[in-house]
Curated annotation (Swiss-Prot):
Catalyzes the conversion of glucosamine-6-phosphate to glucosamine-1-phosphate. It holds the Pfam family PGM_PMM_III. Forms large aggregates. It comes from Methanocaldococcus jannaschii (strain ATCC 43067 / DSM 2661 / JAL-1 / JCM 10045 / NBRC 100440). The lineage of its organism: Archaea, Methanobacteriati, Methanobacteriota, Methanomada group, Methanococci. The gene is glmM. The modification Phosphoserine is found at residue 89. This is Phosphoglucosamine mutase. Keywords: Isomerase, Magnesium, Metal-binding, Phosphoprotein. Binds 1 Mg(2+) ion per subunit. Belongs to the phosphohexose mutase family. It catalyses: alpha-D-glucosamine 1-phosphate = D-glucosamine 6-phosphate. Its cofactor is Mg(2+).
Length: 448
């Protein structure tokens, strides 16, 4: 049987309540006090009920906080042995998932997930007698506790005009209210909860955000200076839309915010992932910042932040972690801190981003069965050195850093693909690097 856990917990199409029940039993064998939250998906209550039944039947206690954003669950996990979020994040509505957090608000790492997975696969459960069945509680203050903590730690002096796109998801319960409490004039869209995501799909990309982007462009024709903040299905991510109605380039925004955090805090360590652009290295070069690259995934970023005492770490996708507040990826807090950055520099978002150079990014995914990925990557590492004339970094897959750009070849953690991503300063170089990367992977597959 393959792994249940991928790069972001358990996530699958038509997640079965049978799996959720077994996860609950496995969790209860190791942890007794559990807090559970869910996003707006139509299967959320079903999965929560099955998961809770497993925990109770294993002798654990459950506190439900109902529909909440993932950062609210992660923040409240500090009061329990473990937190469990039922969400498939940015995936379409037919998907659901289960993500576990420790009491520091840090998502489970591979070792912790493996322990739960082993119990499930061996069916090494303990089902208690009737007199030892656990109890279930409800905490109605979970969102308020989180909001009060954020309000104490974020300060925005400027009165910003903000369009917030909540994706018909759990951000509806928090994001518009926090921004308003901090003095913003807020227009919220897709702000009623609907697990079918009828306003737009939960992936906050350019296609799904077109209406919101056009709305901001129209509002600003009259000089209103709105910017946009959009969330995914569980609000652990954030993307920004500038005053011209353009989706902010993910890598540029990450670089700009990283620079702001260095200048504000004096902490010169920034953690990001192997797939992040070389923009961040070049934009922060004059500040003598150490850029620490990790495997893709918020767990790897958070663990490296702890290890290096970094204040900020993030992925280009908009999954950002603010260690001075908590260790759960937080799209709501990230949106507020983008406004803090604009306040700090007294500039518009487009002015900051347009100062940063643009590079060419290309990517491709090549079908590869999960049981072949390890052999393919061994071939890539062994033969890529002679092809690219450089020794690859192998933090996550193989990254070849070159004079004219870089090539990253890595196995997907959630799908049967090998992903190839390249970056260069012009189209010609980027296309050549992509062709080389694809050719190398196909050679590896042919050699099996």
């Amino acid at each position: 049987m393959g792994r249940l856990f991928g790069t972001s917990g358990i996530r699958m199409k038509n997640l079965s309540p049978k799996i959720a029940y077994k996860v609950g039993l496995a969790v209860a064998k190791k942890y007794k006090k559990v807090v559970v939250g869910r996003d707006t998906r139509t299967t959320g209550k079903l999965i929560e009920t099955a998961l809770t039944a497993g925990i109770l039947n294993g002798g654990g206690e459950v506190t439900t906080i109902n529909i909440v954003p993932t950062p609210v669950l992660g923040f409240n996990a500090r009061n329990y042995d473990v937190g469990i979020m039922i969400t498939a994040s940015h995936n379409p509505p037919e998907y659901n998932g289960i993500k576990l957090f420790n009491k520091n608000g840090l998502a489970f790492n591979k070792k912790e997930e493996d322990e739960i997975e082993e119990i499930i696969f061996k069916e090494d459960f303990i089902e208690v007698e009737w007199h030892s069945v656990g109890e279930i509680w409800e905490d109605s203050r979970a969102i308020r506790n989180y909001m009060e903590h954020i309000l104490k730690n974020v300060e925005i002096n400027e009165k910003f005009n903000v369009v917030i796109d909540c994706a018909n998801a759990s951000a509806c319960l928090v994001s518009p209210y926090l921004f308003t409490d901090l003095g913003c004039h807020v227009i919220s869209v897709n702000s009623h909860m609907d697990g079918r995501f009828i306003g737009r799909l939960p992936e906050p990309d350019e296609k799904n955000l077109k209406k919101t982007m056009d709305m901001i462009k129209g509002l600003n024709m009259s000089g209103d200076n709105y910017i946009g903040i959009a969330h995914d299905g569980d609000a652990d991510r954030m993307v920004a839309i500038d005053e011209k109605g353009r989706l902010a380039d993910f890598d540029k925004l990450l670089a700009a915010f990283s620079r702001y955090m260095v200048e504000k805090t004096g902490n010169k360590k920034i953690v990001t992932t192997v797939d992040a652009s070389m923009i961040i290295d070049e934009y922060l070069k004059d500040l003598d910042v150490e850029i620490i690259r990790t495997k893709v995934g918020d767990v790897a970023v958070a663990e490296e932040m702890i290890k290096n005492s970094a204040v900020f770490g993030g992925e280009p996708s908009g999954t950002w972690i603010h260690a001075d507040i908590h260790l759960t990826p937080d799209g709501i807090l990230s949106g507020l801190r983008v406004l803090e950055m604009l306040d700090f520099y007294n500039k518009k978002l487009y002015e900051i981003l347009d100062e940063i150079p643009s590079y060419v990014n290309l990517r491709e995914k090549i079908p590869c069965e999960d049981d072949k990925k390890e052999k393919v990557m061994s071939y890539v590492i062994e033969n890529g050195e002679s092809l690219f004339k450089t020794v690859p970094e192998t933090v996550d897959g193989a990254r070849f850093n070159l004079e004219n750009g870089w090539v990253l070849i890595r196995p997907s953690g959630t799908e049967p693909y090998i992903r190839v991503r390249v970056e260069a300063k012009n189209n010609k170089d980027a296309k050549e690097l992509l062709e080389k990367g694809i050719k190398l992977v196909k050679e590896a597959l042919s050699a099996l």
